[in-house]
């Protein structure tokens, strides 16, 4: 009898389809598992994440990362908001979130993993072979050094709303979309956001509030579009 890795079994049993209306293929499931193993191994020597238990890793890292691109996990999402997604950037990727799960889920996207800490960039480079990903491009540097060449920008846990807009919106081509991954979100946040958007020739597309599937924590994803 072949014994299976219990962590892999747990990952398979989480409610992907019920909560994302999307199910990873066996290859993607294996890539998530290899990413988990690589992250745990590297985490012993550097501070990549405090979230290591399997249920927490699935919900707070994998699920949360993919929830931000939920519109593009559906068959109808390819032309959503008039955006054809090919070039993606994860700003402040850290241990690879949300960029690596996104790259696994969407192998047809080219995902730049932008990180300001060289040690973390080295880890991100190692994931290409460790996880079997040919569509991730780790880069060391800051957002300000990148031009307007991206169709989709993702920014998670990087400062306040003003800083997120300043980092993300200038990187987008006309029609490109910025996804802000946020915890709590208030009417005051929306009002503040509306004062920021004109300077970037951008508009608010949607604000989606939801609860996480295991811990039932409140989360929001904010979708903004560059218009000029």
From Swiss-Prot:
InterPro entries: rRNA_ssu_MeTfrase_G, SAM-dependent_MTases_sf. S-adenosyl-L-methionine binds at residues 92, 97, 115-117, 143-144, 156. It is found in: Cytoplasm. Gene3D superfamilies: Vaccinia Virus protein VP39. The keyword ATP-binding does not apply. GO terms for molecular function: rRNA (guanine-N7-)-methyltransferase activity. Keywords: Cytoplasm, Methyltransferase, rRNA processing, S-adenosyl-L-methionine, Transferase. It comes from the Bacteria. Its main location: cytoplasm. GO terms for cellular component: cytosol. Its EC number is 2.1.1.-. Specifically methylates the N7 position of a guanine in 16S rRNA. PANTHER family: S-ADENOSYL-L-METHIONINE-DEPENDENT METHYLTRANSFERASES SUPERFAMILY PROTEIN. Belongs to the methyltransferase superfamily. RNA methyltransferase RsmG family. This is Ribosomal RNA small subunit methyltransferase G. The lineage of its organism: Bacteria, Bacillati, Cyanobacteriota, Cyanophyceae, Acaryochloridales. The gene is rsmG.
């Amino acid at each position: 009898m072949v014994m299976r890795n219990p962590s892999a079994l747990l990952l398979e049993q989480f409610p992907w389809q019920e909560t994302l209306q999307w199910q990873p293929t066996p290859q993607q499931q294996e890539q998530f598992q290899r990413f988990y193993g690589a992250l745990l191994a590297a985490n012993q020597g550097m501070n990549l994440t405090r979230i290591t238990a399997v249920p927490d890793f699935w919900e707070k890292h994998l699920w949360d990362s993919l929830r931000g691109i939920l519109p593009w996990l559906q068959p109808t999402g390819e032309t959503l908001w008039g955006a054809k997604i090919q070039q993606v950037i994860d700003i402040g990727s850290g241990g690879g979130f949300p960029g690596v799960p996104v790259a696994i889920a969407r192998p047809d996207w080219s995902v730049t993993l932008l990180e300001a800490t060289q040690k973390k960039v080295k880890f991100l480079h190692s994931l290409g072979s460790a996880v079997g990903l040919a569509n991730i491009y780790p880069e060391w540097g800051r957002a300000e050094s990148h031009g307007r060449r991206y169709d989709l920008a993702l920014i998670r846990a990087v400062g306040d709303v003003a800083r997120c807009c300043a980092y993300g919106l200038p990187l987008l081509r006309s029609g490109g979309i910025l996804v802000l991954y946020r915890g709590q979100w208030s009417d005051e946040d929306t009002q503040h956001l509306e004062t920021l958007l004109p300077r970037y020739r951008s508009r608010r597309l949607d604000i989606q509030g939801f609860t996480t599937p295991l811990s039932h924590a409140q989360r929001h994803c904010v979708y903004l579009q560059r218009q000029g």
